[in-house]
Amino acid sequence: LNNAGEPVTGTRESRTTTSARLSSFGLEDGPMTTAVLAERRPATETLHVLTSFDEVRAATETVAASGQRLISIMTPDLEPEIYDQAALLEIIKRFVLGHSFAKVRVLMRDQARLSGGANRFIAMAHRLTSYLEIRIRAPQYRELTAAYCIADDRAIVYRLRADRAEGIAGFNNPPIARQYLQEFDAVWQASAIEEREVRVARS
């Protein structure tokens, strides 16, 4: 009860819970969060919590398959458990060959972390150079820990730490997708002068 003897609603508790959950994934409870909450109607899906790499892989495939013109990937090393998988590679290939002006952009932390020899995603990028571009992140962005995949400006899979499976997925959530697409674009532009060819390791 409040001072007037009236029952208190759960609005404050709900807001606190929402803030804590978003904060745990590195999302700020601010104007962007307000936009997300305001758009939680049938036209915009809520965020799905991911707890395993199997879920991350499946969500990444769903996000990539929804792309119409642009896929943007932030990753330390094109994580093989996610991106060097036959299903995802086929989705990417169909995306770039099936859509006019389609583009896939990848920002990697460094090439040295590629392990186990050739990465099939990079091999595909060498075959489809008009559609896939890979850049090494500029030095000031090398320590970013997040990993995500964004389709157009609407769908996203996001993890605060690339070495952990915990994350979120929004398959139709423009506010969150645009928030991180803006970050990606800034890193992409800053990394232009650092751009270098990423070579496939050969035995």
Name what the model sees in each region:
Residues 3-5, 10-38, 160-203:
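Signature of lipid phosphatidyltransferase scaffolds
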Residues 37-54, 69-82:
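Acidic/glycine-enriched edge-of-secondary-structure segments
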Residues 75, 103, 108, 136, ...:
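Long, hydrophobic, amphipathic alpha-helical segments used as structural scaffolds
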Residues 133-177:
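HKD (HxKxxxxD) catalytic microenvironment of the phospholipase D
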Residues 63-128:
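Primarily the HKD phosphodiesterase
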Residues 55-59:
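A short, well-structured juxtamembrane/interface segment
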Residues 124-131, 156, 187-190:
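Mid-sequence acidic-hydrophobic segments that form the walls
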